[in-house]
Amino acid sequence: MDLCDHPLVGKLISLGLERGDFVVAGSGPLLAHGLRSSVGDLDIVARGDAWKRATELADPVPAPSGYGLMVLLFDGGLEIFDRWLPGTPGPDALIAGAEWIQGLPFCPLREVLEWKRTALREKDLKDILLIQKHLDREVLDHE
C-alpha cells in the first residue's frame, strides 16, 4: 500500500512538518506495516519546529492522558502530541528510535505492542494480536 494514498497520511504530509521532528505513534505503525487498512486518526509525537508548526495551526489542549498537550487538526483526524503516554520515552528518544517507512517516521511495532499491552483497552486487543502475529512471522522468516 502506498501510504501517500491514505487520506490521513496525505493530510500529515500536507502540513510540511520537519521529518526529523516527529514520529507517528498509536495505530499508525500498523497502517504502515499493512496490518490495518484504516485507522480513525493518526497520533503524532512532535518536537521543535514540527510542534511549533502544529501550534500555529491550532491551540494546544490537554492530552486525554492528562500528560502533556495535544493539537487537534482536520477534525481530530490528526492528533499531534508534545509527548506520548506516561511511562514512555520522551519525544527525543521516540523520534530517534523511529523506523522509516516510505519516507515517514513510525514508532517500531515492538514499542507499539508494549504500549497497547500496558493500556489493554478493548480497542487495542485486536491490534495486540495483529502485531504479535506479525512479529512472530518476522522471527520465523529470519531463522
Predicted regions and their residues:
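Compositionally biased terminal segments of proteins
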Residues: 1-143
